[in-house]
Amino acid sequence: MKIMLKPLMFSLLFIVVFTSCKNNNDGPDVSSVKINLTTKRFEKDFFAIDTNNIIPQINKLATEYPRFSDNFLTTILGIDSKWPPDTTAYYLKGFIAYNRSVYDSAEKIFANFSPYEKDIKKGLQHVKYYFPAYKIPNNIITYIGPADGYGDILDENVLIVGLHAHLGKDFPLYKTSAVAETYPQYITERFTPEYIAVNCMKNIVLDLYPENTEDKRLIIQMIEKGKRLYLLRKFLPGIEEYKLAGF
């Protein structure tokens, strides 16, 4: 269960954080803050599927990734649970074939995911430092999805990283019309590995402090965005300012 802070509680915490923290680009010493974090590479298991025996192997994945597997199929890929098995198998075969080159590129770029896990873990240590009651995700799941679809997601107890959204700003797929219609160039400029931790922490910030969609006044929206950006700075001290913008 996610911990959602009430606006008043958050305002008080915000004041405490704002007035008590030193202006230090390196942030506080969080080395003693214990975070258990495990990364699972869903895309490796998914693209290793024998497409001649796809349904039984998808069912096996469902036991290994019980919550994410269902979300991946229905929400990310858009598969209707009412489809006949043959239709689902045909759709999945097409997705795997079309995205094989994307997976191959991700395998090269993210052969070692440890540096990104380390950055995420450090960010989570800062979250725990400032908000000790917040339930910190202790899992990372990486995946490959449609390039014009979801990217990085926060789910219950897990940070979900869409590697297809971090292959480098000049990756050919991002230049296609299908992707450009969803993600214009100013967004795909940030489709690089260095934004993985940033996006994960942005999702944490939005979980702590959801957007206020009721008050549309510009000044209120500016204040709201400023608060979220301030928190992001605290969670990722030392990160260049241009990487943190974009709320």
Where are these regions (language model features)?
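Bacterial N-terminal signal peptides that target proteins for export
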Residues: M1-M9
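Alpha-helical interaction segments
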Residues: L8-L12, S32
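Glycine- and acidic-residue-rich phosphate-binding/metal-coordinating active-site segment common to enzymes
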Residues: L12-L13, A178
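C-terminal motif of bacterial Sec signal peptides marking the signal peptidase cleavage site
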Residues: V17-S20
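N-terminal mature-domain "stem" immediately C-terminal to a signal peptide or N-terminal signal-anchor/transmembrane
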Residues: K22-L92
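Acidic/His-rich structured neighborhood in mature extracellular/periplasmic domains
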Residues: Y91-F247
